[in-house]
Protein backbone atom coordinates (compact mmCIF):
# COMPACT_ATOMS: atom_id res chain seq x y z
CA UNK A 1 0.00 0.00 0.00
CA UNK A 2 1.27 3.47 -0.86
CA UNK A 3 2.26 5.56 2.11
CA UNK A 4 0.13 8.62 2.90
CA UNK A 5 2.19 11.34 4.58
CA UNK A 6 0.39 13.88 6.77
CA UNK A 7 2.16 17.07 7.93
CA UNK A 8 1.00 17.85 11.48
CA UNK A 9 2.02 21.17 13.05
CA UNK A 10 1.90 21.10 16.84
CA UNK A 11 2.78 23.15 19.91
CA UNK A 12 6.20 22.34 21.33
CA UNK A 13 4.67 21.35 24.66
CA UNK A 14 3.01 18.43 22.84
CA UNK A 15 6.27 16.91 21.59
CA UNK A 16 6.36 13.88 23.90
CA UNK A 17 2.69 12.87 23.89
CA UNK A 18 2.02 13.54 20.19
CA UNK A 19 5.14 11.64 19.17
CA UNK A 20 3.74 8.68 21.10
CA UNK A 21 0.24 9.16 19.69
CA UNK A 22 1.62 9.32 16.13
CA UNK A 23 3.55 6.06 16.55
CA UNK A 24 0.45 4.29 17.86
CA UNK A 25 -1.66 5.68 15.02
CA UNK A 26 0.88 4.62 12.37
CA UNK A 27 0.97 1.12 13.86
CA UNK A 28 -2.81 0.88 13.62
CA UNK A 29 -3.24 2.57 10.23
CA UNK A 30 -1.47 0.74 7.43
CA UNK A 31 0.42 3.07 5.11
CA UNK A 32 0.03 6.18 7.29
CA UNK A 33 3.02 8.42 8.01
CA UNK A 34 2.66 11.37 10.38
CA UNK A 35 5.23 14.15 9.88
CA UNK A 36 5.34 16.13 13.12
CA UNK A 37 6.54 19.74 13.08
CA UNK A 38 6.83 21.30 16.55
CA UNK A 39 7.19 24.94 17.52
CA UNK A 40 5.59 27.93 19.20
CA UNK A 41 1.93 27.92 18.16
CA UNK A 42 1.86 31.55 17.03
CA UNK A 43 4.90 31.06 14.81
CA UNK A 44 3.40 27.86 13.39
CA UNK A 45 0.19 29.75 12.59
CA UNK A 46 2.24 32.33 10.70
CA UNK A 47 4.02 29.60 8.73
CA UNK A 48 0.69 27.99 7.84
CA UNK A 49 -0.65 31.35 6.67
CA UNK A 50 2.46 31.75 4.54
CA UNK A 51 1.59 28.55 2.70
CA UNK A 52 3.39 25.71 4.47
CA UNK A 53 1.59 22.40 3.85
CA UNK A 54 0.15 21.55 7.28
CA UNK A 55 -2.98 19.39 7.24
CA UNK A 56 -3.52 19.22 11.02
CA UNK A 57 -2.78 22.01 13.53
CA UNK A 58 -2.61 21.24 17.26
CA UNK A 59 -2.21 24.58 19.03
CA UNK A 60 -1.64 25.49 22.69
CA UNK A 61 -4.62 27.84 22.45
CA UNK A 62 -7.93 28.00 20.63
CA UNK A 63 -7.39 31.38 18.99
CA UNK A 64 -4.59 30.49 16.57
CA UNK A 65 -6.41 27.64 14.77
CA UNK A 66 -9.67 29.61 14.89
CA UNK A 67 -7.92 32.47 13.11
CA UNK A 68 -7.25 30.14 10.17
CA UNK A 69 -10.95 29.49 9.49
CA UNK A 70 -10.98 32.16 6.77
CA UNK A 71 -7.97 30.46 5.18
CA UNK A 72 -9.74 27.16 4.57
CA UNK A 73 -9.44 25.41 7.91
CA UNK A 74 -12.23 23.51 9.64
CA UNK A 75 -13.75 24.06 13.06
CA UNK A 76 -11.40 24.14 16.05
CA UNK A 77 -12.02 21.48 18.68
CA UNK A 78 -10.67 21.65 22.23
CA UNK A 79 -8.66 18.47 22.75
CA UNK A 80 -6.68 18.90 25.98
CA UNK A 81 -5.83 21.35 28.76
CA UNK A 82 -2.73 22.49 30.62
CA UNK A 83 -1.98 24.89 33.47
CA UNK A 84 0.90 27.06 34.63
CA UNK A 85 3.64 26.03 37.04
CA UNK A 86 6.84 27.74 38.15
CA UNK A 87 10.19 26.06 37.55
CA UNK A 88 13.00 27.00 39.93
CA UNK A 89 16.09 25.62 41.69
CA UNK A 90 14.99 23.50 44.65
CA UNK A 91 17.48 25.35 46.86
CA UNK A 92 15.25 28.45 46.67
CA UNK A 93 12.63 26.55 48.66
CA UNK A 94 9.71 28.17 46.86
CA UNK A 95 6.15 27.20 47.75
CA UNK A 96 2.84 28.21 46.15
CA UNK A 97 2.21 30.66 48.98
CA UNK A 98 5.62 32.35 48.56
CA UNK A 99 5.75 32.33 44.76
CA UNK A 100 4.24 35.77 44.10
CA UNK A 101 6.54 37.52 46.56
CA UNK A 102 9.52 35.71 45.04
CA UNK A 103 8.80 36.76 41.45
CA UNK A 104 8.06 40.34 42.54
CA UNK A 105 11.46 40.54 44.26
CA UNK A 106 13.61 42.83 42.06
CA UNK A 107 16.55 40.44 42.49
CA UNK A 108 14.66 37.50 40.98
CA UNK A 109 15.31 36.81 37.29
CA UNK A 110 11.88 35.90 35.92
CA UNK A 111 11.66 33.90 32.69
CA UNK A 112 8.69 33.47 30.36
CA UNK A 113 8.06 32.51 26.78
CA UNK A 114 7.28 35.18 24.19
CA UNK A 115 3.71 36.55 24.17
CA UNK A 116 1.88 36.54 20.81
CA UNK A 117 4.42 34.11 19.33
CA UNK A 118 3.90 31.44 22.00
CA UNK A 119 0.67 31.05 23.99
CA UNK A 120 2.72 30.07 27.05
CA UNK A 121 3.93 33.67 27.16
CA UNK A 122 0.38 34.97 26.78
CA UNK A 123 -0.77 32.80 29.68
CA UNK A 124 2.14 33.99 31.86
CA UNK A 125 1.24 37.62 31.19
CA UNK A 126 -2.41 36.87 31.99
CA UNK A 127 -1.16 35.43 35.28
CA UNK A 128 0.65 38.74 35.93
CA UNK A 129 -2.62 40.58 35.27
CA UNK A 130 -4.43 38.37 37.78
CA UNK A 131 -1.71 39.04 40.34
CA UNK A 132 -2.17 42.77 39.73
CA UNK A 133 -5.93 42.47 40.32
CA UNK A 134 -5.59 40.46 43.54
CA UNK A 135 -6.57 42.18 46.76
CA UNK A 136 -3.17 42.03 48.46
CA UNK A 137 -1.00 42.88 45.44
CA UNK A 138 1.36 45.83 45.77
CA UNK A 139 0.58 48.80 43.55
CA UNK A 140 2.00 48.37 40.06
CA UNK A 141 2.56 44.62 40.44
CA UNK A 142 1.34 43.74 36.93
CA UNK A 143 3.47 46.40 35.24
CA UNK A 144 6.51 45.41 37.30
CA UNK A 145 6.20 41.75 36.35
CA UNK A 146 5.65 42.51 32.66
CA UNK A 147 8.66 44.83 32.63
CA UNK A 148 11.03 42.41 34.33
CA UNK A 149 9.95 39.25 32.47
CA UNK A 150 12.77 37.86 30.35
CA UNK A 151 11.16 36.45 27.20
CA UNK A 152 13.68 33.67 26.70
CA UNK A 153 11.83 31.17 24.50
CA UNK A 154 9.19 30.88 21.81
CA UNK A 155 10.03 34.00 19.83
CA UNK A 156 11.14 34.26 16.19
CA UNK A 157 14.70 35.03 17.30
CA UNK A 158 14.88 32.81 20.39
CA UNK A 159 17.84 30.40 20.44
CA UNK A 160 17.01 26.90 19.26
CA UNK A 161 16.37 24.46 22.11
CA UNK A 162 19.24 22.05 22.77
CA UNK A 163 18.59 18.77 20.91
CA UNK A 164 16.79 16.26 23.08
CA UNK A 165 16.65 18.57 26.11
CA UNK A 166 13.89 20.53 27.79
CA UNK A 167 14.80 24.16 27.11
CA UNK A 168 13.18 25.46 30.31
CA UNK A 169 15.22 23.17 32.52
CA UNK A 170 18.41 24.14 30.70
CA UNK A 171 17.72 27.87 31.08
CA UNK A 172 17.05 27.60 34.82
CA UNK A 173 19.97 25.23 35.40
CA UNK A 174 22.26 27.70 33.58
CA UNK A 175 21.00 30.57 35.72
CA UNK A 176 19.44 32.54 32.87
CA UNK A 177 16.25 32.58 34.94
CA UNK A 178 15.73 32.01 38.66
CA UNK A 179 12.04 31.28 38.15
CA UNK A 180 10.47 30.31 34.82
CA UNK A 181 6.70 30.40 34.35
CA UNK A 182 5.74 27.61 31.95
CA UNK A 183 3.26 24.79 31.48
CA UNK A 184 3.12 22.24 34.27
CA UNK A 185 3.82 19.50 31.73
CA UNK A 186 7.05 21.27 30.70
CA UNK A 187 8.09 21.70 34.33
CA UNK A 188 7.63 17.98 35.03
CA UNK A 189 9.95 17.09 32.14
CA UNK A 190 12.52 19.69 33.21
CA UNK A 191 12.64 18.37 36.78
CA UNK A 192 13.14 14.83 35.47
CA UNK A 193 16.02 15.94 33.21
CA UNK A 194 17.88 18.40 35.45
CA UNK A 195 19.01 17.68 38.98
CA UNK A 196 18.24 20.29 41.61
CA UNK A 197 15.09 21.78 40.06
CA UNK A 198 11.54 21.78 41.38
CA UNK A 199 8.10 22.52 39.99
CA UNK A 200 5.88 24.82 42.05
CA UNK A 201 2.12 24.93 41.56
CA UNK A 202 0.79 28.37 40.71
CA UNK A 203 -2.07 29.16 43.14
CA UNK A 204 -5.49 28.55 41.62
CA UNK A 205 -6.58 32.16 42.18
CA UNK A 206 -3.98 33.42 39.68
CA UNK A 207 -3.48 30.34 37.50
CA UNK A 208 -4.58 30.26 33.87
CA UNK A 209 -6.14 27.27 32.13
CA UNK A 210 -4.63 26.63 28.72
CA UNK A 211 -7.22 25.15 26.35
CA UNK A 212 -5.52 23.47 23.37
CA UNK A 213 -7.26 23.60 19.99
CA UNK A 214 -7.18 21.11 17.11
CA UNK A 215 -8.13 21.90 13.50
CA UNK A 216 -7.92 20.09 10.16
CA UNK A 217 -7.43 21.85 6.84
CA UNK A 218 -10.39 21.64 4.52
CA UNK A 219 -9.63 19.17 1.75
CA UNK A 220 -7.02 17.35 3.84
CA UNK A 221 -6.55 13.63 3.33
CA UNK A 222 -8.75 11.07 5.04
CA UNK A 223 -5.68 9.99 7.00
CA UNK A 224 -5.27 13.54 8.35
CA UNK A 225 -8.87 13.55 9.57
CA UNK A 226 -8.42 10.08 11.04
CA UNK A 227 -5.33 11.22 12.95
CA UNK A 228 -7.18 14.21 14.40
CA UNK A 229 -10.00 11.89 15.45
CA UNK A 230 -7.44 9.54 17.02
CA UNK A 231 -6.04 12.39 19.16
CA UNK A 232 -9.58 12.94 20.47
CA UNK A 233 -10.24 9.22 20.97
CA UNK A 234 -9.89 7.47 24.35
CA UNK A 235 -6.55 6.02 23.22
CA UNK A 236 -5.16 9.42 22.27
CA UNK A 237 -6.52 11.08 25.39
CA UNK A 238 -4.96 8.40 27.59
CA UNK A 239 -1.52 9.23 26.19
CA UNK A 240 -2.01 12.96 26.79
CA UNK A 241 -3.15 12.37 30.36
CA UNK A 242 -0.21 10.08 31.04
CA UNK A 243 2.02 13.04 30.14
CA UNK A 244 0.23 15.32 32.59
CA UNK A 245 -2.36 16.94 30.33
CA UNK A 246 -5.99 17.21 31.41
CA UNK A 247 -9.24 16.30 29.69
CA UNK A 248 -10.70 19.12 27.57
Question: Which stretches of residues belong to each language-model region?
Answer:
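Exported/periplasmic ABC-transporter solute-binding proteins
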Residues: 2-29, 33-42, 46-50, 59-62, ...
